Structure formats: C-alpha cells, structure tokens
Amino acid sequence: MTRRGSRTLKVDFTAGQLTHFGGIYLLHRFLQQLRFRTLLSQSIRLTEYHHRYSISERLLALVYPMILGLENVELTRLLGTNGVFQYLTGLPQFPRPNTLRRFLIGNAPTLLPQSRHVHNRLRRHFLTLGFSTSSYWLDFDSTVKTLYGHQEGVVKGYNPKNKGKKSYHPLICTEGHLGDCLGGELRDGNAHTASGVKEMFIKILTFLPPVRSLRIRADAGFYDSGFIEEIQKNKASFAVVAHLTRPLKDRLVGLRYKKINKVQSTAEFDYQPHGWRDAYRFVILREKLTEKRKEQLKLFTIEAHAYHVLVTNLSLTPFGVFTFYQDRAGMERIVRILRDDYPFGTAPTQSFMANALYAELSLLAYNIILWFQRLCLPPDWQSYTVETLRHRLLLIPGVFTRTDNRPLLKLPKNSLYQDIFLYADKKIHALNSLGF
C-alpha cells in the first residue's frame, strides 16, 4: 500500500498569541529581578518631550534583538508583530526600525557616555557576584568588521582576510577567567591596533574590584611603550608579544637556550627598545620545526627554528610566561562570538557615534547573556555557546493564554530542557536586585 501525505489539509493563518521566543521569559525575569530597567531609567537622562517610548524601552528594544540573534535593526520588525514577546518583555508595541535608528542618530553623543557608565557599574557588580579571586587577567585584542557603504569611519585599513576592503577596527578587553567584556570601543578602520588601549586600561581600573594582582596579556599589535609604561605605573604584570625588530632578531642566535623538551627551549635577556624609557625582560621560546609545522607558522625562523618573543615583568620562568600567555586563546573565541553572534562593529546608520552606541549595547547584550548563564544555569551548561543557549532555551515556541483571568505562557510539554528552564527560574527568583 502506497502511503502519501495528506491531500486535504487546509492552512489558515488565524492562530493568535503565538511566539517563537517563549524562552525570552527567562531573560525578562532575570532583568526584572535585578531591576535593570529601573537602573536605566534612573541613570540615563535625556531631554525629550512627549515621546511614545521611554529611554529604557528604546534601549531594551535594541538589546533584546541582539540577545535573540537578530542580526540588524531591520529585523526588529519581526518583534513588532509579536504581541506575546511584547507582553513578556513589557514593551508595548515594539518600536519600528526607523524609530530606533533616529533614536541612535539623534541621541548618541549624550547616551554613549551615560550607557558606558551604567555598563561599567554593572561590570563591577557582576565581577564580584558569585566569584572570588585574588587576581584578574585582562586580555586586550582588536578585530576587523568588513563593511560596505559610506558610513563615517568605515575606511581601508588593517584587514588581513579582506585586503583592500573598508572596515571598522574595534578594540576589546575581556577578563581571562570569566570572559566578561570589560571594555569595547568602535574605531575607524585605519586606527592603529594600540590606539586608545592605554585610555581603556585606565578606565577599566576605575571600576575593577580591588585584587592582590592584576595581569595583562596582549598580542604584538599592543607592543607599545606608552601602554606598557602605564601597566608598570599601576603595579600590574604583563606579557605582550614583541615586534621582532632587527636589533631583537640579532640577539636571538647568540643566546644560551635551556631545553624544555625535544622541540622547545627557552632563553631570556634584558633589553631597552629604541625610544623606550626603560629596559625590560624579554623571554624567548625557540621551537624546532618539522616540515608540517613550517607551513602552519608565520613566525620568524632561523635554521629550522621558530622564535616566539614576549616582553614581560612577570617573575615566572620563561616557559611559565609562555604558558600564561597561551591561555589567552579564550580571548580569540570571544572576539569571534562578538563578531559572528552579535552585531558588534556593524553599522546600522551612517553616523559613527550612533554606530558606537550600537556597539556598546551589543557588548551589554553579550554580558547579559554571560551573567545569566553564570548565575542561573547549571554547571554543565557553563561552557555552552550563545548559539546553543538560544536554540535550547530562548527560541522555544510558546502559546499565550489566560486561565481564571491570569496570564499563562504554555511551552511544549515534550521540551527536552524543561528541568533546565525551571532550574533557571528558581535561581532567578533567589537573586537580589542591583541595589545601586
């Protein structure tokens, strides 16, 4: 007997009170429990008259789509027709994309510094919440976001994957243990990698909780005397990849190397680079190359050896310094997440300041998800990516009904993650408000 699908099924677009975003209830409850909207309302001031949406409503209307993975402002239209989402998040009639763009363009110079100030207060709060440490590790990096159009600041610059293409060149700082983004700044596409890093470091110090030690890691783009002097001035430790200038290269061959294993050996020396005020400790990791390894590396080589060089003030052994630096791989993963899973570094408007505000809000969206994950989800969910969290918890279908005149959100009874949902809801209920 031949089996066929139904030939008589009818389709009717009449169902109401449905949503793709049933799981956003958890994020809404998380922010509600913290009294996040109250914090925005009390901390961010803007002179306006008779606007349909409050400042906090428009800021959240920008942040929520970022959390859900909607890639640009235009896609917020999807939420404008979703009454259940609007009810769950307390956003009556979601603002239109043009409304949000005008909000960014018209108010960015006023809102950006205030938003950063609020974000920094939140960063300090969540660094100390549920986590105890005697040391923070700050990782600095930059990324490139290729863009098309004529937006302010989108110019040709360092863009190794798309050479000759225009881009922004944002700067980022994260904490090495937790992954929190402690700073981010949109920059012109032709900005030097180290441009603004000293100022960002100084700003982070103003809200970083006191600890016994502070360590900084950065790649060769941040091999900058001003940055390193500022680190020294603040009694912090650092490991920064050195530029292999000719004087440095000339020193590598004549050193006495200590063998670590069959392929690696280390050495060190003190050296004052040209134009620097002081001499610093330089540590070298020499690696014996196979033919396969030669193809993988883009490092300075001499006689079948590759040389990795760090400038540091750490008291660790040379190999210990490299072990510490190599733990920085987590930063590269975070950069990819910000670039690929959030709209960090994109250009929703032609205005640089408006796009910088949008970038700051995307970092806030990233941190909100991270804080929610750390405080409200089980230990075995701590390593999950934002894409997995969206798929398993946030983007689950729901039906909104009323029972005994009380609102009820119905989620699928066969959900694989019902226990996780209830676990998170219980954890949220136990949280204290921000109390700023």
Predicted features and spans:
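Dynamic "connector" segments at or just before major functional cores
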Residues: 1-165, 169-209, 234, 396-436
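An anionic, glycine-rich sequence signature occurring as long contiguous blocks
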Residues: 2-9, 13, 237-340, 398, ...
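Short amphipathic alpha-helical "interface-anchor" segments enriched in bulky aromatics
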Residues: 30, 76, 144, 318-361, ...
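Short, solvent-exposed helix-loop connector elements
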Residues: 42-50, 318-325, 341-357, 373-384, ...
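Short, glycine/acidic-rich hinge or "gate" loops at secondary-structure transitions
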Residues: 77, 93-94, 214, 376-386
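Generic beta-strand/beta-sheet core signal
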Residues: 79, 141, 184, 217-219, ...
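Acidic/histidine-rich, metal-coordinating catalytic segments
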Residues: 213-223
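Catalytic cores of alpha/beta
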Residues: 225-229
